[in-house]
Amino acid sequence: MKEKDSKNKELLKNTFIIFIGKFCTQFISFLLVPLYTKYLITSDYGYVDLILTYISLILPIVILRSDSSIFRYLIDERDDKKERAKTVTSLFVLIIIQIFALLLLSTITNMIFKIQYIVSIILSTIMYAFSSMALQYIRGIGDNIGYSIASIISGITTLIVNIVLIVSLKVGGVSILISTIIANIFCVLYIAFRTKVYREIRRDSFSEKKLKKMLKYSIPMIPDRTFLVDDKCI
């Protein structure tokens, strides 16, 4: 009975910690809306907002929903350093390959259509990919406090950079993209230094077999995420 109560308390504690991090991020996003509507041209803000929606749409394809996979597998591998290294290294290699593919396709697309803010769009997508993986990694190893702190750092950085670029420097709509890039960089760096995850990325830890196994789990989940945002694109 005591063991059950202890597990319930731990579950409530972890749920609350994660809620704090997510709530902070959502609250800051809510605070930014009046800032955007007051200082940005409607067409500029609308364009960037649509771009962010497209990024949300293609991100699951870029990372093949491997953020869900890393969370799922690390839960069972928290105490197995060898398997953890295989999981992290294999997915890191996958992300690097996918990023090169993204760069190639983006370059070709931009040559044809001349997309505004293309560099910021590419960097935003890349950093969203890394931050998504990093956040699910830190959750997977059970560091929920670190997860919440990283989310809060990302949210506060987004707020500060937006205020500086939009209000003080009058940079315009691209400020939103720049702020997400910087915020995600800070988020990834914090998680990297807190968890020392880079120590788990080793050449001899790459496992093609493990990667295929994880992709079998994650790829079927791609449509689920894309359907959440495709109505906004339409």
Task: Identify the residue ranges that each predicted region occupies.
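Interhelical loop/hinge segments that connect adjacent transmembrane helices in multipass membrane
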Residues: 1-11, 119, 145, 173-177, ...
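Signature of the first transmembrane helix
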Residues: 10-64, 154-159, 219-234
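Membrane-water interface segments that mark the loop-to-transmembrane alpha-helix transition
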Residues: 13-25, 51, 56-110
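Residue-level recognition of transmembrane alpha-helices
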Residues: 18, 22, 49-52, 91, ...
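Membrane-interface helix-capping segments at transmembrane helix termini in multi-pass transporters
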Residues: 40-51, 76-89, 99-126, 168-177
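C-terminal transmembrane helix end/exit motif
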Residues: 70, 135-140, 144, 166, ...
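Membrane-interface junctions at transmembrane-helix termini in multi-pass inner-membrane proteins
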Residues: 73-76, 128-151
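Hydrophobic alpha-helical transmembrane segments
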Residues: 119, 149-197
